[in-house]
C-alpha cells in the first residue's frame, strides 16, 4: 500500500481517527500526517484471504483472533504517533479492545508490493518491533514464493527466509503451521506464471 501525502497540515490522532470513520479511502497516520493507501492487486487479496482463513481455522475456539485489512495497529506513542493498516493481524489480549485499532497485537502480516515493500521492510518493521507483545512480523512476497519472518528472540530479533512451495511457516505461539503453497493458493505464482508488473 503506497503512502501518498494527504495534506500539508498536521492533524491530531483523534482528528485522524474521526476522519477515518467516514473516509472513502483508508489512510495511515504518522506523526501528524495522513497518507492515502493505494488499492491492492487480486493476488495481494488472495494471499491476504489465504492467511486469514488459515489463522481463523487455527484460532477457532481460542483466545486469539485474526483481523484483516480494516483493523489498524496503534504504535506506542513513546516511539511515534502512528496508526498502520496491516494486511492481517492477530490479537490475543482481550483487554485490547478499541473498536478500530489494536495496541497489543501478537502477530502482523504484510503482503509486499513494489509500492509498499520499502515502507513495510523498514519503517513499519522498526515501528512494529516497538510493540512489546509482537511475537513475529511476517512479510509475504506476492510475485514469487518467499516469506520473511522477523521473530522476537532474546536478545533482539531473528530473521528467517522461507522459499519454495514446500516450505512451512511455523508460528508456535498460536499453533499454526502452514505450507507456503497454501498461502499462495489461486495466485498467479501458484499457476506457474510470474505476476505482471
Each model region followed by its residue ranges:
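Gly/Pro/Ser/Thr-rich low-complexity, intrinsically disordered segments predominantly at protein N-termini
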Residues: 1-197
Amino acid at each position: 500500500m503506497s503512502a501518498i501525502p494527504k495534506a500539508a497540515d498536521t492533524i491530531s490522532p483523534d482528528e485522524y481517527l474521526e476522519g477515518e470513520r467516514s473516509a472513502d479511502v483508508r489512510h495511515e497516520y504518522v506523526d501528524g500526517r495522513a497518507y492515502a493507501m493505494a488499492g491492492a492487486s487480486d493476488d495481494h487479496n488472495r494471499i491476504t484471504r489465504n492467511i486469514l482463513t488459515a489463522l481463523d481455522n487455527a484460532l477457532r475456539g481460542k483466545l486469539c483472533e485474526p483481523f484483516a485489512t480494516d483493523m489498524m495497529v496503534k504504535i506506542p506513542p513513546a516511539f511515534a504517533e502512528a496508526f498502520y493498516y496491516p494486511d492481517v493481524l492477530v490479537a490475543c489480549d482481550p483487554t485490547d479492545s478499541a473498536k478500530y485499532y489494536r495496541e497489543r497485537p501478537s502477530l502482523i502480516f504484510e503482503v509486499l508490493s513494489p509500492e509498499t515493500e520499502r515502507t513495510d521492510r523498514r519503517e513499519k518493521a522498526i515501528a512494529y518491533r516497538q510493540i512489546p507483545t509482537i511475537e513475529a512480523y511476517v512479510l509475504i512476497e506476492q510475485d514469487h514464493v518467499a516469506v520473511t519472518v522477523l521473530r522476537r528472540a532474546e536478545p533482539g530479533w531473528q530473521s528467517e527466509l522461507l522459499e519454495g512451495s514446500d516450505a512451512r511457516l511455523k508460528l508456535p505461539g498460536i499453533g499454526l503451521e502452514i505450507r507456503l503453497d497454501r498461502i499462495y493458493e489461486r495466485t498467479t505464482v501458484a499457476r506457474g506464471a510470474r505476476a505482471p508488473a
